[in-house]
Design a protein with these regions (language model features):
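N-terminal amphipathic alpha-helix/helix-capping segment at the start of soluble metabolic enzymes
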Residues: 2, 123-134, 343
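Flexible C-terminal active-site loop/helix
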Residues: 2-18, 30-34, 109, 297-366
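Conserved, mostly hydrophobic/aromatic
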Residues: 3, 46, 70, 109, ...
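Metal- or metallocofactor-binding catalytic centers and their adjacent structured scaffolds
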Residues: 42-120
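A cross-domain feature marking catalytic cores of carbohydrate-active enzymes
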Residues: 53, 99, 140-143, 168-170, ...
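Shared catalytic-loop signature of beta/alpha-barrel
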Residues: 68, 207, 213, 221-243, ...
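Metal-dependent enolase-superfamily TIM-barrel catalytic cores that perform enediolate-based chemistry
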Residues: 127-237
């Protein structure tokens, strides 16, 4: 089965009117829309697979990488020999970097190829990876609001929707405290600050965070590859640490884990190489007795990749990150079966669900 075509499809889906957010790693304050990049791979036998690259400000760069660097290396190759092909692509392109938009683009093509292989086998991807759970726990991952009243409202809405674990992206203590006050003692809170602090600053802030009772503090240090600093903060603060979203290679995940830097490891399938690389992290983490909590702050094939891999390879404490955005539309419409803090693993062939063609037509941009 030969790869006949690769198409990168950028989407821009607006937030619903009245939605407010603060500036963050993904965009400016009151971001009007969220950008995604889907990748469609077609074979000579007519099978189609879908992948996703991490989006936001990187969409244009990732699309360029797909169109000009990756597609020419993949078209005409065997779609079923995924890992050999992706290794060849990485070796050919490594001089342009091992992370960033190029890695996002490689991730999208890899996910699409796994979708094709599952469809060819007429089996859900989780079965190809070893079987597993029919349902998974999920947590609501909120945007950054900064204003305590907005944080309270978002926390309240997520709890009313049935979530028992929430992720904040706040960096100011009043907003973080407001979230805990609104949530009460029985809701789990995690805090992702997106790498803002030195080790000294993080130690000072960690003292203030001890009363918040966080399930984990995520990516507190700049630079994100300061694994020794994370290990020191983990030891001195007593707060569980999570990281891995911005780790791109298997070697660096081993360094992260060997440093004793984390209580939870967070590979991101739409950033670090797709399913081929993601599935290697679970046994690596098991050696270190560390749960895998995939980063999946997206709602397309990258999310489904995280769901299938976690269903097959995760542990009882693994959870799915569910982006809690108020958008005009979603890539899969209402097809994903969710209820409160649970999500059903799609059981169709491959990733189990294809993107809604009406959404693609309505929100595609150039």
């Amino acid at each position: 089965m030969i790869i006949a075509g690769i198409e990168a499809i950028p989407l821009r889906i607006p937030f619903k009117a009245g939605t407010k957010s603060d500036a963050s790693a993904w965009g400016d304050s009151n971001l009007p829309a969220t950008d995604s990049l889907l990748v469609k791979v077609t074979t000579d036998q007519g099978l189609v697979g879908w992948g996703e690259a991490f989006g936001f400000r990187a969409v244009a760069s990732a699309k360029l990488a797909v169109d000009q660097l990756i597609a020419p290396l993949c078209i005409g190759q065997d779609a079923t020999r995924i890992e050999l092909l992706m290794l060849a692509v990485q070796k050919k392109l490594h001089v342009f970097g091992r992370g960033g938009a190029l890695a996002f683009a490689i991730s999208a093509v890899d996910i699409a190829l796994w979708d094709i292989v599952g469809k060819a086998a007429n089996a859900p991807l989780c079965q190809l990876l070893g079987g597993g759970a029919a349902e998974l726990d999920r947590y609501a991952s909120l945007v950054r609001y900064s204003e305590p009243s907005l944080v309270r409202a978002a926390v309240r809405q997520a709890i009313e929707a049935g979530f028992r674990t929430l992720k904040l992206h706040e960096i100011e203590l009043p907003a973080i405290r407001a979230a805990r006050e609104e949530a009460g003692p029985d809701i789990e809170l995690t805090l992702d600050v997106n790498c803002p602090w030195t080790l000294y600053e993080a130690r000072q802030i960690a003292e203030e965070l001890k009363g918040i009772d966080l399930k984990w503090l995520e990516e507190p240090l700049w630079p994100p590859e300061n694994f020794d600093g994370l290990a020191e903060l983990r030891k001195s603060s007593g707060i569980p640490i999570a990281a891995g979203e911005n780790v791109y290679t298997l070697m660096d995940f081993e360094r992260l884990l060997a440093a004793g830097a984390v209580d939870f490891v967070q590979p991101s399938p739409a950033k670090m190489g797709g399913i081929s690389e993601l599935r290697k992290i679970f046994p690596l983490a098991a050696i270190h007795n560390i749960p895998v909590m995939p980063h999946s702050f997206y709602d397309g094939p990258g999310l489904l990749a995280a769901i299938h891999a976690t269903a097959a390879l995760g542990t009882d404490d693994s959870m799915i990150e569910w982006r809690w955005f108020d958008l005009e539309a979603t890539i899969y419409g209402d097809v994903l079966n969710t209820q409160g803090g649970r999500i059903s693993v799609p059981q169709g062939p491959g990733l189990g669900i294809d993107p809604d063609p009406d959404v693609i037509r309505a929100y595609r941009w150039k």
